Amino acid sequence: VLGEDSTPGTAEFDLFIKEVQKEMTVKAGQKCTAVRRIIVPEKLVDDVQIALGQRLSKTIIGDPQIEGVNMGSLAGNEQKEEVTEKVNQLSKTQEIVFGSLEDFEVTGADKNKGAFFSPILFLNNDPFNNKDCHNIEAFGPVSTIIPYNNISEAIELARMGKGSLVCSIVTNDMKAAEEFVRGAASMHGRILVLNEACAKESTGHGSPMPLLTHGGPGRAGGGEEMG
């Protein structure tokens, strides 16, 4: 979640773009803590789309043994077929604004034989009615930009995942951060508050650290919250 105060030119905006790009592409997005929903202020949607697209465009897909390659393949062709199917399902209710299922380059490997996949960025302009992005998970480098108009909407959208392992809010407004955490916490295993002051010490959005909760309510766990 991008805070309303985290506008282009702030350290927090840059942190947000960097963190989202990292969580989309590390292990080709095949992580249970990867960012699937990018919740941003409606007024900043265009800025986020442009900045994130520019950063994702630097992704070099291919054989990880080759210098310069920074994203490898999916686990296998079966996984590629599954992610492709999920992307096609998501495409029915939202628009791809970066990436392609076919038009991308692969370095040092055969694109047609390997399970390579381009980062795919969606935009969902009506996330309260077009709910696929909350219910369909493409387990690869796939994520959706979702606009909100106020912190209450951001909380509601975050909770529409019906249980998530981890959520982050990137803001320097501690009042807004507190309101978000109080409202969204019961649907998340953990929530990271990230800003310039703590960035150098932060392990990041998706780090599975021994002392952090790695599980959660609803879809994020096996019912541990129910005893």
What do the PLM-derived regions correspond to, one by one?
Residues 1-128, 152, 156, 184:
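ALDH superfamily catalytic-core signature
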Residues 1-7, 18, 22, 54, ...:
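Conserved C-terminal structural/oligomerization subdomain of aldehyde/semialdehyde dehydrogenase
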